[in-house]
Swiss-Prot record:
Keyword annotations: Glycoprotein, Immunity, Innate immunity, Secreted, Signal
Species of origin: Galleria mellonella
Record note on quaternary structure: Monomer.
InterPro entries per record: BGBP_N (IPR031756), BGBP_N_sf (IPR043030), ConA-like_dom_sf (IPR013320), GH16 (IPR000757), GH16_GRP_C (IPR035806), Glycosyl_Hydrlase_16 (IPR050546)
Signal peptide: 1-19
Protein's name in the database: Beta-1,3-glucan-binding protein 1
Top-rank taxon: Eukaryota
Length: 490
């Protein structure tokens, strides 16, 4: 079957006249024999049906029926099996798949029971006997007499699955355990399709010492790879003292420091190039389980960013007022690389910045190999796992995060009272993956750090000390490498 590198799976949508919907498949038992499965044409380029009769599907197996339909007819995408011999009480287990505007949408765990028949035109019929091919009796609860007068259901009164508390950024409902998002990075990143590649200067609140460009992210051997390089390696020696204008392709706010920087005196251009990608424009969700298999980078002052970021920032746009969720982070310095941490950040600075983060000390350096990092985000808390082992829980107090934050003079705390006890972590978030360098909050000041966080010359001092940190960066080990990203409904 046609395979997409990136798929967003959403199923069983409500009818909504003002918004996009993916309709449920319509199944019909044809008298005296036949099965018809159809969807209304909504701009699809492919419709696939996979099903089994009276036997549950094993995951995404092909099934007894396995067919790709590449053309619609009469305004519908239709699969027909004119030889199928169905009886009242038969149950069909199925899943369907459509491609619309280059994106794949799958309807999982479908179940449909034969309660009546229609003719080829779709008109209900009331046969006086079961089809000739029926060789087994109907279930005890359904007799031929009652089956004859049973009308096909005219509306869907129950959900076809147990509903999840997870929500996605399109109308509809989500089933428990449903795979909502997956990218195995088997193909290159299509800019603007699922992932948006940042092209901008990152700024507050952490002010990292890098610029995000398209150049430093690519896919190789089924892995997403984000590599740090110096600005001089692209633009020439001493370019940190020049001007860099990204306006033409900038993904930040045009006319601001997001898109244009001019060096002046001790204020230099960010001396390192990295990359960052996100799903903000295509996929966001509320509550779920995020799984990322990744290898963290090795090298001084490197910070891998595997995050969930707030889509609408309804509680404020500054100082992480609307929250940030770290799926996992291992800093690149040798002295830090045995420490894994993850969880929520609700303030840009201490003492409240890291209070809710959970840590796990490894027997070895986490960046020596790939690991599975998981964050489970629920309406009542957060759990963190590595390679299937839980290493931390974050549960809001009875008054939410507000009480503790207020004690630490977090300005945004009062805004959280507008939400649930999980506020500000109770709205839609999107996935972002990137690599940062240095900055003014991630590393505490020390005698071995070449800059002071509050110093005006912080970035310049970092750059002037490059003979110390740059030799710790290697092409094969200083990149953030991601094998896959998956999001499941709770």
């Amino acid at each position: 079957m046609y395979k997409q590198t990136v798929v967003i799976f959403l199923l069983c949508f409500f009818i909504c006249v003002s918004c996009y919907e993916v309709p449920p498949a319509k199944l019909e038992a044809i008298w005296p024999k036949g099965l018809r499965v159809s969807l209304p044409d909504d701009g699809y380029s492919l419709f696939a049906f996979h099903g089994k009769l009276n036997e549950e599907m094993e995951g995404l197996e092909a099934g007894h029926w396995s067919r790709d339909i590449t053309k619609s007819k009469g305004g519908r995408w239709t699969f027909n099996d004119k030889q199928a011999k169905l009886k009242i009480g038969d149950k069909i287990y199925f899943w369907t798949y459509v491609i619309k505007e280059g994106l794949g949408y799958r309807q999982d765990n479908g179940e449909w029971t034969v309660t009546g028949y229609v003719d080829e035109a779709g008109n209900p019929v009331a046969p006086t006997s079961q089809p000739d091919a029926v060789v087994t009796e109907p279930p005890a609860a359904i007799t031929p007499a009652t089956a004859i007068v049973t009308n096909p259901p005219t509306s869907q009164n129950t959900y076809p699955c147990e509903i999840s508390v997870s929500m996605v950024s399109v109308p509809g409902f989500v089933c428990k355990g449903q795979l909502l998002f997956e990218d195995n990075f088997n193909k290159g990143i299509d800019k603007g399709n699922i992932w948006t590649t940042e092209n901008m200067f990152p700024g507050e609140p952490d002010y990292p010492f890098n610029v995000y460009l398209y150049d430093n992210v690519h896919v190789r051997d089924g892995k997403l790879i984000i590599t740090p390089t110096t600005l001089e390696s692209k633009y020439g020696e001493d370019y940190v003292r020049q001007q860099l204008d990204l306006t033409q392709r900038c993904t930040g706010t045009i006319g601001t420091a997001d898109c244009t920087r001019v060096a002046s005196g001790p204020i230099i251009l960010p001396p390192v190039i990295t990359s960052k990608i996100n799903t903000k424009n295509r996929f966001s969700f509320k509550y779920g389980r995020v799984e990322v298999r990744a290898r963290m980078p090795t090298g001084d002052w490197l910070i891998p960013e595997i995050l969930l970021e707030p889509r609408d920032r309804i509680y404020g746009i500054h100082s992480y007022a609307s929250g940030l969720l770290r799926v996992a982070c291992v800093k690149g310095n040798v002295e830090y690389s045995k420490t894994l941490y993850g969880g929520p950040i609700l303030c840009d600075s201490e003492p409240y910045r890291n209070v809710n983060l959970k840590q796990k000390i490894g027997f070895d350096h986490w960046n020596k190999d790939f690991h599975n990092y998981t964050l489970e985000w629920r309406p009542d808390g957060i759990s963190l796992f590595v390679d299937g082992e839980k290493y931390g829980d974050v549960t809001p107090p009875t008054d939410g995060f507000y009480g503790d934050a207020k004690k630490e003079n977090v300005q945004a705390a009062s805004q959280w009272l507008k939400g649930t006890s999980m506020a500000p972590l109770d709205d839609y978030f999107y996935i972002s993956i990137g690599l940062d360098v240095g900055g003014v909050h991630e590393f505490p000041d020390s005698s071995t750090k070449p800059w002071q966080n509050k110093a005006t010359k912080a970035m310049l001092n970092f750059w002037n000390n490059r003979d110390q940190w740059f030799p710790t960066w290697f092409k094969d080990t200083s990149s953030l490498q991601v094998d896959y990203v998956r999001v499941y409904a709770l």
